Amino acid sequence: MVKSEALCERLVERLELGEPLSVIAKDKEFPNVSTIYKWCRKDKTLRERIMEARKQGVWTLLDKIAEEMQIPKTPQETHFLREKYSHIRWLASKLA
């Protein structure tokens, strides 16, 4: 697959929305994860854009979870959401 600015922009947009790179790479529109990492090794600007998009994506996920927490849940759903929130919060602390 050939790297293009349009493809990289779509990749960045999806990362900003909180989608994991592994999920995005399964989409036929995108190359596999190893190809994306290869591009990043060769292109410092792309690498920086992707890292910033991933940081933004974590904040997007925090916002989504904060929204979800406003809706009443069963105890089991609450436990799952709490675990998910803890993981996202941990990611945010590592990327900050």
Please describe what each predicted stretch is.
Residues 4-5, 9, 13-88, 92-96:
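Charged, helical or coil segments that form electrostatic protein-protein
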